[in-house]
Amino acid sequence: MSNKSRGCNYERQLVDLLHQRGFAAVRVAGSGAKPLPTPDIVACRKGKILAIECKTSRKNQVYLRDEQVDELKVYSRTAGARPLLAIKFLQQQWHFLKPSRLPRTNGSTMVVSREFISKRGMKISDLDPLVD
């Protein structure tokens, strides 16, 4: 299975988890290939919208380009959504971060480690206060 199809499967899994928590959620097909800012998942509950960019890794860190985070922020401002990053490491549950909580690094790439997300990331149940 390719990395792309594996990532799509994880996104579908997250959509299912969000549905189980009462969200109306959809995966935006081809989100990374479009010329316009588009998140991987859009989830809504009680009139509140979450724009979610997903990252998965088998390693101990994920890399995010500044432009990916900037595009998530642009989409979120336009849609009136709350931007979130959803990060999943192999053998761990999904964790969520607001872009403002991302660790800064030199250059145009941010690195989020398995340890950082375990300590600072939100669990799926922590999304409830964002939309209730």
Language-model regions, residue ranges each:
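Alpha-helix C-cap/termination motif
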Residues: R21, C44, Y75-A79
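Active-site metal-binding core of divalent-cation-utilizing nuclease and nuclease-like domains
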Residues: A24-K46
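Acidic-basic catalytic patches of nuclease active cores, encompassing PD-(D/E)XK
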Residues: M1-G30
